Amino acid sequence: MPMRKRHFYRLLPLASLLLAACTIPVSKGPATSPTSPQWRQHEQQLQQLGQFETRGAFAYLSDKQKVYARFFWQQTSPERYRLLLTNPLGSTELELVVQPGVTQLTDNQGKHYVSDDPQEMIQKLTGMSIPLESLRQWILGLPGDTPNFTLDDKYRLKKLTYQQNGVTWVVDYQEYNTQVTPPLPSRLELNQDGQRIKLKMDSWTIK
């Protein structure tokens, strides 16, 4: 009987060590810090991309509608860009041309609309809520105006949360294209109160 007690007591320190090992917090490391020099360098490279083009697949999903299209985004300057949505047959569903102070939208009937607010115009004409002003930054992998973001282990944007006027958008970066320099997103998803926007970038052209 005494022998069993001594054996039991000898096991207690070992068990305590095992429990302690299971509860030791794992450090996330410097990659998740927005103040890391690697992120700052990557961010500066992205901010210098004044002209670029990307094309791929677009999906807008909500309780009221589901829209699937091909998209083409052409940025010619920080304040000038063109967004084209086409159907599987290649016909234009929507073309948006944004310049400082004026936005022109052309629908699938060839009708033209002019406004100074591209996001509001698209929502009124199509029912889709697309945060275009922020999307210009997010599509490159930049957080834009939000300080609420995390990085992956390669010092790239992983997830962000953006709040404005009572509306919260959550953006998840699911994949990056490492064949271009700097690496740019190839798949991302935006979520806002039951609405989802999925973007898959098949190619990037940097000018």
UniProtKB/Swiss-Prot annotation:
Membrane topology: Lipid-anchor
Top-level taxon: Bacteria
Location in or out of the cell: Cell outer membrane
InterPro entries: LolA/LolB/LppX, OM_lipoprot_LolB
Keyword Signal in annotation: yes
One of the record's GO cellular component terms: cell outer membrane
Lipid moiety-binding residues (N-palmitoyl cysteine): 22
Biological process terms in GO annotation: lipoprotein localization to outer membrane; protein transport
Lipid attachment locations (S-diacylglycerol cysteine): 22
Pfam families, per the entry: LolB
Key words, A-Z: Cell outer membrane, Chaperone, Lipoprotein, Membrane, Palmitate, Protein transport, Signal, Transport
Signal peptide region: 1-21
Protein family according to the UniProt entry: Belongs to the LolB family.
Subunit structure, interactors included: Monomer.
Role, per record: Plays a critical role in the incorporation of lipoproteins in the outer membrane after they are released by the LolA protein.
Name of the protein described by the UniProt record: Outer-membrane lipoprotein LolB
